[in-house]
Regions:
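Short conserved loop adjoining the S-adenosyl-L-methionine
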Residues: 3-10
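A conserved beta-strand element that flanks and buttresses the S-adenosyl-L-methionine
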Residues: 16
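Short alpha-helix
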Residues: 75-104
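A short His-aromatic
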Residues: 19-23
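Conserved class I S-adenosyl-L-methionine
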Residues: 43-72
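Short aromatic-enriched loop/helix-cap "lid" or pocket-rim segments at secondary-structure transitions
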Residues: 12, 56-60, 113-114
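Core SAM-dependent methyltransferase catalytic element
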Residues: 95-96, 107-137
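A short glycine-rich, Lys/Arg-flanked "PGG" loop and its adjoining helix->strand segment in the class I
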Residues: 28-43
């Protein structure tokens, strides 16, 4: 299931995208749209579980792969550090974001067997608008 962000005509000083990128079918398109929602000095706060293991939720609890793949450097990263660096240099910067801060934070998910709680690593990125996007639409 995909929902589009409505065109509001407004921009915002702060936009958050918390644990959504790995669950959406078009993560690059979502990031482009979120960038459009920022004021020139606005901040985008992105949290994503790493290493990158996307699973788009479908009806009846089924999952599928995203229709839009992130670069190989992100998909192949095995550690938190590799994943965070790959997201910064292969995704956020080419989309026209400056990475201001990265932090490792715990994320508790009910994604384990039988709904058990699993402790994961979230990469929390503080992004601002930088140079124009170099990734084709």
């Amino acid at each position: 299931m995909q929902a589009e962000l409505p065109a509001t005509g407004f921009t915002h000083d702060l936009v958050t995208c918390l644990n959504v990128l790995d669950r959406t079918s078009r993560p690059l398109a979502l990031l482009r749209r979120l960038r459009e929602l920022l004021t020139p000095s606005g901040v985008l706060l992105v949290a994503v579980v790493v290493p990158w293991r996307p699973a788009v939720l479908q009806r009846a609890g089924l999952t599928s792969a995203p229709s839009e793949a992130l670069p190989a450097a992100v998909r192949e990263a095995a550690t938190f550090e590799q994943s965070a660096a790959a997201l910064a240099t292969s995704v956020f910067e080419p989309l026209g974001f400056d990475v201001r801060r990265v932090s490792r934070v715990p994320y508790l998910s009910r994604g384990g067997p039988r709904g058990s709680i699993v402790a994961l690593d979230d990469a929390l990125f503080v992004l601002t608008k930088g140079a124009t996007s170099t990734v084709p639409k």
